[in-house]
Amino acid sequence: MNKIFDYTFLDIIKSYRKIGLKKNQSIYVTSDLSKLGKYEKKTKKGLLSDHLKALKTIVGKKGNIFVPTASLNLCNTNKIFDLKKTPSYQMGILSEFLRKQKNSFRSLHPFWSVCGIGINAKYFLNKISSHSHASGSVWEKFVLNNVIAVNIGIKPNFAIPLVHHIETIVGVPYRYNKEFIQKIGNQN
């Protein structure tokens, strides 16, 4: 008998637990779910809902789930960044799905925002530096609070912006700051 899908909801739960995810954790998820194969539910909404449900089930009510919602395509444009409406750019369908959840919060950064849900999501994403990776940034809060990076279907060199935070803090000679001016619309 040929199976018509590669994995199930139970497989998602088992896999997340196998890599060490557990209750009350805060996690930062970068993903390309297309790399995982065919899911038992054939709809895009079913796939996204179940991955988010699995993550929520594992981290529980005291955990937090964060995703990248960067919109780097706004750099050097006249487009206005809107906290609620501006979509992420090339960050994956799970990121966009989480961004659109009613209970999600997004950091106010026009180019490198992060979105999250959970008991402390607002704390992590509010009152951050205007420099995307410097002291006072989301990344500093992630480091200070042991947020776990989870890469799904993405090579680590494309999925760990935390490295840029470390490079900025340490002051490596090959990084430099480049300022961009961007109009920001709705901030609520």
PLM region descriptions:
Residues 1-188:
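N-terminal and secondary-structure boundary signal
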